[in-house]
Amino acid sequence: MVKNYKELVAWQKGMELVRRVYALTRDFPEVEQYRLVDQLTRAAVSVPSNIAEGFGRTTNKDFAHFVAQARGSLFEVETQLIIAQDLGFVDDVTADIEEIAELGKILNGLIRSLIRGRG
């Protein structure tokens, strides 16, 4: 049984995503610092933050709701990385998209587990 949200693979992968997004956006054009960079970093930070907040809730239903919020933020990050690539701010986000897909599967599994009452 997991005793702390930091033990959750979903949270750990979410933290990896945050580090990756911050590294990727470090060299974005200055004009994008309050546009795409801000949106990307906020969405990325939202993934592990929502997992942690959900873990602190008292019911599996509430926890599942926050994990679903994290999943929504994950899809935001994916879309924004594709936009960044299309605009020429990053070269290739294929590996990042694959990591996002893996984390999405982990989040889906966690949601299913919580809904079934095994969270």
Give the positions of each predicted feature.
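Amphipathic alpha-helical assembly/interaction segments
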Residues: 1-119
